[in-house]
């Protein structure tokens, strides 16, 4: 299953607030379609599937990509669910979004793909790059790159920057001081249900 490229608000109406996907307010807070307003009791499978879909759409991943992250999280020591969230949050595209350098993760992905972003002085065009403590994210020293990020910083997607990140607006840079804590993950979901979903497949 490839990455979703359809209407973002439609997905938000179905899954709830997905801060990384869209900044648009949900005018009708119920699922799309003629049966969207009818209350239904979902099955256990449907609940696990919905949590998995929240994760996939918020971070803009294909099914194959998310499955790879789950497998990687299981190999590391600690809570698989929390490690999974840390791996996704430390992606370069998400880190740019959380710094406020882009209003959404898709917008951050465009910055990376178009070569506007540097890490420790070198252009990095891989959205899935895993940011590490001690690294410095800067904007390419080109006027068009600076103007674009400055316009995004004026209206950030989220109000608060996580404690592991440090933004310097004056020189358009962000320092990574550690790994994100669970409490700073903006997406509301139960990550254990995502792990359960894949363990039952």
Swiss-Prot record:
PROSITE patterns: RIBOSOMAL_S4, S4. The keyword S-adenosyl-L-methionine does not apply. InterPro entries: Ribosomal_uS4, Ribosomal_uS4_bac-type, Ribosomal_uS4_CS, Ribosomal_uS4_N, S4_RNA-bd, S4_RNA-bd_sf. Residues 90-154 form the S4 RNA-binding domain. One of its GO terms (biological process) is ribosomal small subunit biogenesis. The keyword RNA-binding applies. One of its GO terms (cellular component) is chloroplast. Gene3D superfamilies: Ribosomal Protein S4 Delta 41, Chain A, domain 1, RNA-binding S4 domain. It comes from the Eukaryota. It is found in: Plastid, Chloroplast. GO terms for molecular function: rRNA binding; structural constituent of ribosome. Pfam families: Ribosomal_S4, S4. Residues 13-43 are annotated as: Disordered. Keywords: Chloroplast, Plastid, Ribonucleoprotein, Ribosomal protein, RNA-binding, rRNA-binding. Belongs to the universal ribosomal protein uS4 family. HAMAP family: Ribosomal_uS4_B. Part of the 30S ribosomal subunit. Contacts protein S5. The interaction surface between S4 and S5 is involved in control of translational fidelity. One of the primary rRNA binding proteins, it binds directly to 16S rRNA where it nucleates assembly of the body of the 30S subunit. With S5 and S12 plays an important role in translational accuracy. This is Small ribosomal subunit protein uS4c. The gene is rps4.
């Amino acid at each position: 299953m490839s990455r979703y490229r359809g209407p973002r608000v439609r997905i938000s109406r179905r899954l709830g607030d997905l801060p990384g996907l869209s900044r648009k307010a949900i005018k009708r807070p119920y699922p799309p379609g003629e049966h969207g307003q009818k209350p239904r009791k979902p099955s256990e499978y449907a609940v696990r599937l919905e949590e998995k879909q929240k994760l996939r759409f918020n971070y803009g991943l294909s099914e194959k990509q998310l499955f790879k992250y789950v497998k990687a999280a299981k190999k590391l020591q600690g809570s698989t669910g929390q490690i999974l969230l840390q791996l996704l949050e430390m992606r370069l595209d998400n880190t740019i979004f959380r710094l406020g350098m882009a209003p959404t993760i898709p917008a951050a992905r465009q910055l990376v793909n178009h070569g506007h972003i540097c890490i420790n002085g070198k252009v990095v065009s891989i959205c899935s790059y895993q940011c590490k403590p001690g690294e410095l994210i800067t904007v390419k020293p080109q006027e068009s790159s600076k103007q674009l990020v400055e316009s995004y910083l004026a209206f950030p997607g989220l109000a608060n920057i996580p404690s592991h990140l440090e933004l310097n607006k004056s020189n358009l840079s962000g320092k990574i001081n550690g790994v994100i804590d669970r409490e700073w993950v903006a997406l509301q979901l139960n990550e254990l249900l995502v792990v359960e979903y894949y363990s039952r497949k």
